[in-house]
UniProtKB/Swiss-Prot annotation:
Top enzyme category: transferase
Molecular function terms, GO-annotated: GTP binding; magnesium ion binding; uracil phosphoribosyltransferase activity
Biological function: Catalyzes the conversion of uracil and 5-phospho-alpha-D-ribose 1-diphosphate (PRPP) to UMP and diphosphate.
Superkingdom, taxonomy of origin: Bacteria
Residues that bind 5-phospho-alpha-D-ribose 1-diphosphate: 79, 104, 131-139, 200
Protein name: Uracil phosphoribosyltransferase
Family: Belongs to the UPRTase family.
Length: 209
């Protein structure tokens, strides 16, 4: 079973509390999502493998460490996942970015996929799926399904806020996928929103309703 790790760094928790506020502006919301994503990036990349490499400094030759193994890919679930991409790219600017587009059927609460655009070598990459919220788990499961159909095997799911119901469903559907979140909230309400949550992340990021 994949782990679900709550990243409780003080800076992340402070920024998340501001993000949740109803009166946080679109501009501030967008900036906070980017900042929290960057801070989370340090934690979710903690186990990336390193290798020795010989370099020449201005003074002498020396053996130092650099990232080894698989290259990285950031895959946001559209729309809201876009807000987390730049935070990750500020840490790993060479990472490729794919996109998986989905919308939620408001009657069934089930996700509907409308776009999949991925790097050609996605099967050779360590993948971070990013989406601010893990609610029912439907979008996350469908995103992992789409990636695995294309040969991807090393996948992590990164969100800002998760509901226990979504975590459980994703772990049951894909026990090999680790989940990283800044908060594990109480529950889902009857409309499939996380409580206390932060509202509709996509609308708050882009100033839409």
């Amino acid at each position: 079973m994949g782990k679900c790790q709550v990243i409780s760094h003080p800076l992340i928790q402070h920024k998340l509390s501001i993000l949740r506020r109803q009166d946080t502006s679109t501009k501030d919301f967008r900036e906070l999502v980017n900042e929290i994503a960057m801070l989370m990036g340090y934690e979710v990349s903690r186990d990336l493998p390193l290798e020795d490499v010989e370099i020449q400094t201005p003074v002498a030759k020396t053996v130092q460490k650099q990232l080894a193994g698989k290259k990285l890919a950031i895959v946001p679930i559209l729309r809201a996942g876009i807000g987390m991409v730049d935070g990750f790219l500020s840490l790993v600017p060479a990472a490729k970015v794919g996109h998986i587009g989905m919308y939620r059927n408001e009657e069934t609460l089930e996700p509907v996929e409308y776009l999949v655009k991925l790097p050609e070598d996605i099967d050779q990459r360590q993948i971070f799926i990013v989406d601010p919220m893990l609610a029912t788990g439907g979008s996350a499961i469908l995103a992992v399904d789409s990636l695995k159909k294309r040969g991807a095997a090393n996948i992590k799911f990164v969100c800002l806020v998760a509901a226990p119901e979504g975590v459980k469903k994703l772990q049951e559907a894909h026990p090999d996928v680790d989940i990283y979140t800044a908060a594990l909230d109480e529950r889902l309400n009857d409309h499939g929103y996380i409580v206390p949550g932060l509202g509709d992340a996509g609308d708050r990021l882009f100033g839409t309703k």
